[in-house]
Amino acid sequence: MVRESFESVACVFVLTLFSELPGEWILKYKDKLIGNKPILKVRGSEDWFNGRLETKECILLDVTIPRDEFDAEASATVALWENGVQATDTNSIPVKYLHPVYPAHLGTTVVIFMGPLSGKQGIIRSIDSDAEVIVVEILEDQVLEDVQKEYMTLCVADHFG
């Protein structure tokens, strides 16, 4: 009973985090994100695109911002990322369906999109398997900072290299 209760709380936390993470974070940091080709995860609805891309990982290539209020919502051009390989064909996905894939390996390049260091880029220098706070070397300042894991998304450049 206690385990089920804990899992329910953890599930609610994750869902709350994703529901509070608007697609605008991609728009705000699109220049830094596009340049580093971050890996994102599609978290949409089965109603959208018949659910074919749900939970797929992809690389952000470009972002299209609506010109006026009558245009469709902001969308991202992405290439699927499977088994460490970028697909050659692309898909257009509304930014609201894209969420970060959090870093988990030393040396991974990250973009921080929330918190006091938002907009900065860094490299993971220390991480524990259960850590919620990760030590990141901020590239701009070359200083080590503690950053909450859910505040950053990984970038392809160093992830599998």
Residue ranges and their predicted role:
Residues F13-L21:
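Basic, amphipathic alpha-helix used for nucleic-acid engagement in HTH/winged-helix/SANT-Myb modules
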Residues M1-V12, F70:
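Eukaryotic Ser/Thr/Pro-rich intrinsically disordered, low-complexity regulatory regions
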